[in-house]
Amino acid sequence: QRDCYDELVQKKIREPDHFDWQKQARFYWMHDDERAQICVADVPFWYCNEYLGVKERLVITPLTDRCYVTLSQALGMSLGGAPAGPAGTGKTESVKDLAKGIGRQCVVFNCSDQLDYKMMGKLFSGV
């Protein structure tokens, strides 16, 4: 977060509608609804209160920043996203960290050639 503020100060961002400010995850308490709202770019999310434990957050790089904005836009349109890239570059961790930031559960499973429809059924039913 400190790096985010340093970047905003360095770029002399003063307007609340500037994209460099809008792309940051912003948390608001909505008094009328008595719950928290998170906004990323122009997409609002209700905080889902999913307890995820106390863990370290991911280090934010320009690439993870773009990933969050892109995935947030997709979620805002009721779509999904599938980050692509070489192994070990943080694709899964970026998705999990975004889910943690908005308080939603993120289930990760690996699709292999042994994954059949019975196992998928168990996964979707929560077994």
Where are these regions (language model features)?
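Short charge-dense sequence patches
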Residues: D17-K23, D42-Y47, T70, L75-L79, ...
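Active-site-proximal structural scaffolding
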Residues: T64, G88-K91, D113, Y117
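Extended, charged/polar low-complexity intrinsically disordered regions
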Residues: Q1-P62, R66
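Conserved alpha-helical scaffold flanking the Walker A/P-loop in AAA+ ATPase domains
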Residues: L115-V127
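Walker A/P-loop
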Residues: Q73-N110, L123-G126
